[in-house]
Structures are given as C-alpha cells and as structure tokens.
Amino acid sequence: MTTTIDTNQWCSRFVKCKGCKLDAECMVKPEEMALVREDGKIVDKWAIRTTEMIARELEKLKAI
C-alpha cells in the first residue's frame, strides 16, 4: 500500500515553513537524510521528526 502525503495540507500549516525549502523545523542535517542502523534497527530520522511534528499539530487541532 502506498501513502501519499499532501504537502499543501501539512507543510503550509507550520508557521516557520516557507514551502518545502527545508528551512523549517523539518530541516535535518545531511547525515539524518540517510537511513541509519541503531540497535540493529533501520531508522529514518527525518520521517520520525516530521511524524512527531504532524502529531503535535493534530493534537492542537483536537483541542480547538
């Protein structure tokens, strides 16, 4: 199954975001763009960071 993320739906909601120029909170260091192995597991740090960012925004929407 493929999941498509609508960046217009999410990215524009973040105050710091300037339209996916990677200068917002979601910006990562070059070494974080690659998958890494930690404790025998493959980790995508960029995906973790953006997922947490979206989760925070969803919680804010629930509170409204």
Swiss-Prot record:
Query: What's in the keyword line of the UniProt record?
Result: Host-virus interaction, Inhibition of host innate immune response by virus, Restriction-modification system evasion by virus, Viral immunoevasion
Q: Is Oxidoreductase one of the keywords UniProt gives this record?
A: no
> Which biological process annotations from GO are given for this protein?
symbiont-mediated evasion of host restriction-modification system; symbiont-mediated suppression of host innate immune response
Cysteine disulfide partners in this protein:
none
Per its UniProt record, what InterPro entries does this chain match?
Answer: Antirestriction_protein_Ral
Which Pfam family, just one, is annotated for this protein?
A: Ral
Q: What does it do?
A: Ral interferes with the cleavage of DNA by E.coli EcoK restriction-modification system, by modifying the activity of the host methylase. This modulation allows incoming, unmodified phages to escape the host's restriction system.
The similarity comment for this entry is: Belongs to the lambda phage ral family.
- How is this protein named in the record? Restriction inhibitor protein ral
Instruction: State the organism of origin.
Output: Salmonella phage P22 (Bacteriophage P22)
**In the UniProt record, what gene is named as encoding this protein?**
ral
